[in-house]
Structures are given as C-alpha cells and as structure tokens.
Amino acid sequence: MTEPYAGCSPQESAHLREVAEAAAARSAAYLIDAFRTPMAVDHKGGPHDLVTEHDLASEAILRADLTSAVPDSAFVGEEGGRSGQGRVTWYVDPIDGTVNFSHGLAYWCVSIAAAVDDVVVAGVIAAPALAQVFAVDLDGFTVNGASAQPRRVEREVDAFVISTFPRHVDLERNGEAALHASGRLTRAFGSVRTLGSGALGLAHVAAGWADATFDLHTNAWDVAAGALMVRAGGGRYLGLRAGVTDENPTTAHLRPAYWATGGDVEYPTLREVLTGLSRDARVNGSAEPEPTYP
C-alpha cells in the first residue's frame, strides 16, 4: 500500500484511479488506431522535440473526460499547459514517448496522475501497443488488474537500469561530461538501456521488470503517476534539483530530475553521477529552471 493521506480517503483515491483508467482507455483506443499510420509531425523546441497531431487529440480527450468526471479539478497537460482550478489536479502526458510513437516503436504510453492538495493519490499509465495498463491508488499497484511490486537488487553489477539518458538536452547541459557519465553507468551496472519513455521506465521499476530508472530532464506530467507506483511497493523515488535530492511526496515529482529504485537500496555510482550532473548543469547556467504550475 502507499502512504495514507488524511486529505484523501482510500475510496476517493480509488474513484480517481477509476476515472483515470476510463479516460486513459478512451485515449488509448484512439491512439492505437493512429499508431503506425501516416501522421502530421511538428517540432516544439527544436529538431529533437516532436509533437504529433495525435498528442494534441489525445490531450483533448483526456482534458474533456477528466474535468467533466471531476469538475472540482485543474488540468496540467504537456501540450496545453494548465487550465481550470480545484482541489484535484490532473497531471497528464497524452503520449510519453512521442518519438517512439511517431516512428512506429511500441514503447510509448499515456500517463495520468491525480493529486489532491498537492499529494499524488492515484495514477494510470496505459501502454496500448504493449497491452499493459499500470494503475495505482492508496490501496496499491496493479498491472492489468493483478498486484505487482518492485524487486530489491542490492548490487549495482546485478541491476538492470532503463532511462532516457543521454539525450541531446543532456549534451547541451553537461557537454562531454554526459558521455563520460554514460560510460561510468554502463560499466557499473549489469545492463543499461535507453528506451525513450520516462513514465514507462518508472512503471517497469514498479512492476519489478527493471531495478532503477532516471532522467535529468523531466516534468510532473512525465513522472507523477510513475513515482507513486514505485513508492506503492516500497521502492524509492528521489526528485533532484541542483544536486539536492527530495523524497517528499508533495514536491519530489515537481523536480526537474530524478532517479528511482525498486527497493530501499543505495546505488552509489548512480547517486554520484546524477547529483554531479545536476549540480554542474546548474553551475554552468545551462539547465532549465525547475518547472512551476501556477
């Protein structure tokens, strides 16, 4: 079970999870029909940052469904930003892994999290091309309706790590140090894979299919659901900003970087590499500011 929260009952948490599941299912049905078909693709912040017509359509579906089901809510989406206000805040990524989606690679998902008074209490990550739905509320975490939990792997050399690192933004922020860091991690861990969806990386750690995951360039809509999933089974999610870690469940998902592990374990190389890169990027003045959602 996840940590109890006085501001949200288990019944309300379960209701929010059910609302998210229904919205995710409708979006997933739309997206799976669009997957591997010709589509309009544009660039948001540069040649590496894609958005498709289906990101926008998926977000419109989710915004309409979530806010109509829970009128007392705000919506924070990757494509359209924040709208509305209320006790509940929905953090939504309509397609996490847009590059994969646009090229026909099946590793992408829809991610939805519900926060009550800033505490994330429910979430859904739907990966229709993989036929997987990850869901969490205050009573626990499931994969396709069956209970699941992370595994605890003590030694780095035995651990399997998935991430989105290094990307172009990591090279822009940290230069050659990012490549050196990638080499250190590859040597230290049993296996490191770059798969292109932070939300699915967290879901895989929560399910026990990977032992750690991390990203140095993220937003709340990418990680809010997955962070709760990891913690639900006793794993750790550490937000990271300017070399300082944060495990507070009300703020960790708002930090611009993170790592997560499948148990209460310490991976010294991972901590040293990530805190160093996070700290140095801030010193160099090249990191993006911490995201805010007014």
Where are these regions (language model features)?
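Generic detector of well-ordered alpha-helical packing
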Residues: 56, 79, 94-97, 128, ...
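N-terminal subdomain of lithium-sensitive/metallo-dependent phosphomonoesterases centered on the IMPase/IPPase/PAP
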Residues: 1-95, 281, 285-294
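Short, isolated positions in well-ordered beta-strands
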Residues: 121, 147-150
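Residue-level signal for inorganic ion chemistry
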Residues: 27, 31, 55, 66, ...
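DPxDG-like acidic metal-binding loop motif
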Residues: 64, 85-139
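An extended, acidic
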Residues: 152-294
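Short amphipathic alpha-helical face segments that pack within enzyme cores
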Residues: 61, 109, 225-228
